[in-house]
Structure formats: structure tokens, C-alpha cells
């Protein structure tokens, strides 16, 4: 049986589901950029890419060298093809306008170029997260300047989302709104090959991921829920749970898509003005789209994440996503 490459899969989607050719091209360009990022990550100290830049991004986070390198790879790969009207990145203060010398396209690309970059120096998994939106008609004119408002669309408006994870293998996990597929990079071929055809999250689980060092800062509903998880079979949930934490959302979510589980990053009391740590546009929305398409659920503790109307490019949210049964339980505790 012949292997199905990402290119073949996307062409077949164009034939069977009328996936637009420009969207197909965009996904292929993002995938090529992810291969380049994977190559840079794999070089590590040999490529002189470890360590920090000595600068901070708009979030106030210290930028690693690979954060900046990955951001530039994605910008340069996508700016010239004529399929995008603009881009936005966790590493940039403002939206990126496609240079005037290139044609503008119908889509917007939003990305976290290197999620989990604190793992780089310890050789643990990192990844790239991306989301594709349609550009509002009023910004499609070649002469119309793009601004932040064009990107402020709820997650339900995403036409595609995915991530690449750079671990023992490099994988690209993708949804076009019709289920979730996983592609593994065959380095000899230089192509992503379909290896996970129908990724589905079990409804129930006995595994959760949360940073327990923040426990003292959590709100009461989170304290209650996590204490019940830790109580195991002697507690109200009547079963034992294992805890996992990789400190990279892309790695924790990949595990959940592979075998089920619950990922939590609750809001806490340290910065009451901020509703969470993770970014809605770059992290929560694309991951929520993937998780829902795989049969899971995703909320901020009160409402479905994909229904949130963004108010800013770098807006933060609390996140509970994964196996539906546990997401619904955690959300119910917030509403009690």
C-alpha cells in the first residue's frame, strides 16, 4: 500500500471536500517551515542556537535564540506566496503586514513559533502551534493596511489549525475541520507521511496535566477539583489518577490526543487582572479546535474557549481541555 504524504492528503481534500487550493498551499508552506525549525532544533549546541537573546517579547518573557529563529523562518516562508493577508505571532508586538511587493491572499496566519522554549536547553520536547483564519473582506484590498482587528475572531472561525512537535520524531498534527490527522516526518523522504488517520480522545481518563507548584494560587473550584483527583479511589471520583507535566503545552496536548487525559492551566491569584497564562489566539484556540475535532472538550472554566470573542492579539485565558468527562466536571465546579 502506498504511503499518503501530506501533499497527497491535501490534494485529496481539495478533490473531495473542496478545500481551497490557497489553503492547501498555505498548509504545505507552514509544514515546510516546521521542517526547517525541526532541523534547527535538532542541531542544538552544534548549531549555536541554545541560550537566550537577552531580549523580551511582548509577554515579558525572555526570548530564546530559537524563539527568534523560528519566528523568522515562519515569516520568511509565508510572506511571499500570495496566500496570506497578514500574520501574527506570540513573539511580535503587532500584526505583520505582508510587504507591498508581494500579492495579498485571503487568509491570516497566527502562530506560536516555538512553544515550550524553556525546554530547549534541556533537550525536552518543544513545538510550533498555528491557526488559520479568513481575512475579513475589508482588509483584502492591496492598499488597505492590516491591523489587529482583522485577527480578533472567535475560535469558531478557524478554517485550519495544527501543531508540529519536535521530539524523538517530528510530527505534524492537523485539522481542517473534519477530524484530526497526524503526519510523521520521514527524514529520508523529506516528507510528512500520514501515520495517525483518525485521532480520537477517549471520553474518560485517569491522567491529568497541571503545574502543581502553582496550587497555592488557585481559586477554590480548582483546589477542590485537583484535591479530588489526588484523593484517588478513596475519594469522591472513585479512581486513581496519574499526573504528567512536560512544561510545553504542545507536548502535553499531544499526549492527550494520543491516549487521553486532561490539561489544565487555571487562572490564579498572583495577577488578578489576567484571566490566565496561555494566549487565546496562539495557543488556546488552535489547540481547542484540534481537541474538539478529536472528540474532546475545551473551556476556560466557564465557557467554551472557541466561543470567546478576542479583545486583543495577546489576550490570555485559563484552559481546561482534553477528555470530555473531566473537562465538564472541572467546568461544573467553577459554576457551582
Swiss-Prot record:
Keywords recorded for this protein, A-Z: Carbohydrate metabolism, Cytoplasm, Hydrolase, Magnesium, Metal-binding
Example GO molecular function: fructose 1,6-bisphosphate 1-phosphatase activity
Pathway of action: Carbohydrate biosynthesis; gluconeogenesis
Cofactor binding comment, as recorded: Binds 2 magnesium ions per subunit.
Binding site for Mg(2+) 1: 90, 112, 114
S-S bonds: none
Record's catalysed reaction(s): beta-D-fructose 1,6-bisphosphate + H2O = beta-D-fructose 6-phosphate + phosphate
Enzyme class, spelled out: hydrolase
InterPro entries the record matches: FBPase_C_dom, FBPase_class-1, FBPase_N, FBPtase
SUPFAM superfamilies: Carbohydrate phosphatase
Compartments where located: Cytoplasm
UniProt-listed Enzyme Commission number(s): 3.1.3.11
Positions bound to Mg(2+) 2: 112, 115, 283
Residues that, per the record, bind substrate: 115-118, 211, 277
HAMAP family associated with the record: FBPase_class1
Descriptive protein name: Fructose-1,6-bisphosphatase class 1
Native species: Pseudomonas syringae pv. syringae (strain B728a)
Gene from which this protein is expressed: fbp
Amino acid at each position: 500500500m502506498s504511503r499518503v504524504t501530506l501533499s497527497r492528503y491535501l490534494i485529496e481534500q481539495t478533490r473531495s471536500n473542496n478545500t481551497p487550493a490557497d489553503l492547501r498551499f498555505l498548509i504545505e508552506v507552514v509544514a515546510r517551515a516546521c521542517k526547517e525549525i525541526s532541523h534547527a532544533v535538532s542541531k542544538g549546541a552544534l548549531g549555536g542556537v541554545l541560550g537566550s537573546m537577552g531580549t523580551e517579547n511582548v509577554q515579558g518573557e525572555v526570548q530564546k535564540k530559537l524563539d527568534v529563529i523560528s519566528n523568522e523562518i515562519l515569516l520568511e516562508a509565508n510572506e511571499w506566496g500570495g496566500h496570506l493577508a497578514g500574520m501574527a505571532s506570540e513573539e511580535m508586538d503587532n500584526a505583520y503586514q505582508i510587504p507591498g511587493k508581494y500579492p495579498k491572499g485571503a487568509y491570516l496566519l497566527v502562530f506560536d513559533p516555538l512553544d515550550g522554549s524553556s525546554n530547549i536547553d534541556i533537550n525536552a520536547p518543544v513545538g510550533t502551534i498555528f491557526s488559520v483564519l479568513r481575512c475579513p473582506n475589508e482588509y483584502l484590498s492591496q492598499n488597505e493596511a492590516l491591523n489587529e482587528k482583522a485577527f480578533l475572531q472567535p475560535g469558531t472561525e478557524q478554517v485550519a489549525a495544527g501543531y508540529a512537535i519536535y521530539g524523538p520524531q517530528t510530527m505534524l498534527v492537523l485539522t481542517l475541520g473534519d477530524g484530526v490527522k497526524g503526519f510523521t516526518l520521514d527524514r529520508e523522504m523529506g516528507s510528512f507521511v500520514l501515520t495517525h488517520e483518525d485521532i480520537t480522545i477517549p471520553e474518560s481518563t485517569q491522567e491529568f496535566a497541571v503545574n502543581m507548584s502553582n496550587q497555592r494560587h488557585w481559586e477554590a473550584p480548582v483546589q477542590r477539583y485537583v484535591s479530588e483527583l489526588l484523593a484517588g479511589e478513596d475519594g469522591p471520583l472513585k479512581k486513581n489518577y496519574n499526573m504528567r507535566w512536560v512544561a510545553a503545552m504542545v507536548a502535553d496536548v499531544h499526549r492527550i490526543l494520543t491516549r487521553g487525559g486532561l490539561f489544565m492551566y487555571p487562572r490564579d491569584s498572583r495577577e488578578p487582572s489576567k484571566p490566565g497564562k496561555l494566549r487565546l489566539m496562539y495557543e488556546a484556540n488552535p489547540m481547542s479546535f484540534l481537541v474538539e475535532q478529536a472528540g474532546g472538550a475545551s473551556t476556560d472554566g466557564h465557557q467554551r474557549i472557541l466561543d470567546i470573542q478576542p479583545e486583543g492579539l495577546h489576550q490570555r485565558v485559563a484552559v481546561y481541555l482534553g477528555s470530555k468527562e473531566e473537562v465538564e466536571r472541572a467546568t461544573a465546579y467553577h459554576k457551582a
